[in-house]
């Protein structure tokens, strides 16, 4: 792909995409020759839905789908993750602003929109099968590197049973817009000091607790348990109609499943894609899993399975 000298490559994420910033035009080229529909067509569709609902997301400036790229508005390079690294004083205040954005996201009713090819895109439901398959990334990629062959077979059978049981215990319906990667690295502060959303292509209609679990138990950014509790309580305070007990149950189950998935993804990145930098984040993912397992009796059986195989990370 040939670009003018005005475009500078941006350090990429864990996906197959490449990004190029043009500061003169205030734009970014998103290039994707793998998983093209998701990374270009669906990405733009989700952005359109967010913008339609008065949220800040990158607008499409131009598209060249045949040559594997789109040009989008540049929201800037100041992520909340970067702000937090520089200043730890106002984190709770900023988290409250993030929760206000999340509340706005969760009011979205649109499920369908026309993409730039003039074809309707409909957001899919976050079905239990998807959650199950995501959790199985842990057993598919991480387990073979950590257990012997005999243990692998036994673990995988038991693990599948545990995950299915946990999914059957979720209370909330799939009726809420879920970003799926709602964390401080994907939240950008623009020139007007407003919070914008990036990396939006994975959105589904799912459980209300998922994005909050993604934000609070974020593997890339360590927060104290006391801050986690404060942010969680602020969400409940701004959503008084929610059944707190049922919500807590779903939050804890989804947090554990998400971080098991993430461990699997990080091992896959290392083994398949030779991207080893994410391996150092795995111990913190384990720490958050252990923290949530200790708080929900419905997770006891999974806790025992993990503790018997990974006593270094999970307390019995």
Each PLM stretch: what is its role?
Residues 264-316:
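ATP/Mg2+ or Mg2+-diphosphate-binding catalytic cores
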Residues 242-252:
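Acidic, serine/threonine- and proline-rich low-complexity regulatory regions
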Residues 10-14, 62-65, 254-255:
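A short beta-turn/loop motif at secondary-structure boundaries
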Residues 2-21:
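ATP-binding glycine-rich phosphate-binding loop
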Residues 16-23, 105-106, 164-212, 219-223:
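Active-site acidic catalytic loop and adjacent metal/ATP-binding pocket
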Residues 136-146, 208-242, 256-273, 285-292:
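Active-site activation/catalytic loop segments of kinase-like enzymes and analogous catalytic loops
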Residues 1, 110, 117-118, 122, ...:
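An alpha-helical support segment within catalytic cores of ATP-dependent transferases
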Residues 20-133, 171-172:
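ATP-binding pocket architecture of kinase catalytic cores
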